Regions:
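Membrane-helix interface segments
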Residues: 2-8, 56-64, 87-88
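"…centered on the first transmembrane helix and the immediately adjacent amphipathic helix/loop
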Residues: 1-51, 67
Length: 109
């Protein structure tokens, strides 16, 4: 049951990341209170932790790689939206957050 709960939460978190990354910028105003880099890093750190918790036998660094890949894909997709653009800094923030989440999970195992 615990795995199902974390899988549902993970899916919702992914949906929120996709919306926040691809929605028109006007729809996500006010999300930059703590700084864009911190927001990206937190989002992907949380995603990594949630994904690890949703696995029976977690492979932490594979999960980190999947989170980094999602972040890169979303950054690339932003270049196809009207008022968004892909950013290397955002991709680095996503990867940093995923690595922090993975390190936290590895430390807590």
């Amino acid at each position: 049951m615990r795995l199902i709960v974390f899988r549902v939460i993970s899916a919702c978190w992914i949906a929120a990341l996709v919306f926040g990354s691809l929605a028109p910028a006007d729809d996500v105003q006010g999300a930059y209170v703590f700084g864009d880099f911190v927001l990206h890093a937190f989002g992907y750190a949380a995603l990594t932790v949630l994904l690890v918790l949703s696995q029976r036998h977690p492979r932490i660094w594979v999960t980190v790689g999947a989170a980094v890949a999602l972040g890169m894909v979303l950054e690339i997709l932003q270049s196809f939206t009207g008022d968004r653009s892909a950013s290397v800094i955002d991709a680095v923030a996503n990867a940093t957050g995923a690595a922090i989440g993975g390190a936290f999970c590895w430390w807590r195992r």
